[in-house]
Amino acid sequence: MADGPVSGGREELTLYTRRGCPLCEDMAAHVRALLSGTPHGLTPVDVDADPALKAAYGWDVPLLFHGASEICRHELDLPAFQEWLRAHS
């Protein structure tokens, strides 16, 4: 199984979020800034739009994933994110 989605050499991170979540907005902004200049992308997914995701994560957002691997939750764990970025550069 692959670590995460890849599209033309570009690896996608998934940010599980919900509308009106300030922590989600903060994490999205920080991750986008840190990914700037890299081939990687960020795909936000609203957990409220999918009953299975809403049941799985409830209010436990934001969550940042690469494929099935969780990188961090609730706030950006900069050391963990930088470790992921080094491993995927």
Specify the residue positions occupied by each region the protein language model found.
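Local sequence-structure signature of Cys/Sec-based thiol-disulfide redox active-site neighborhoods
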Residues: 2-33
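Short helix-capping segments at alpha-helix termini
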Residues: 35-39
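Thiol-based oxidoreductase modules, predominantly thioredoxin-like and allied folds used
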Residues: 40-51
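A short, hydrophobic beta-strand/beta-hairpin element that forms part of a small beta-sheet core
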Residues: 61-70
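N-terminal, polar/charged subdomain of small-to-medium soluble alpha/beta proteins
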Residues: 70-77
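Thiol-/selenol-based redox modules, centered on thioredoxin-like
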Residues: 81-89
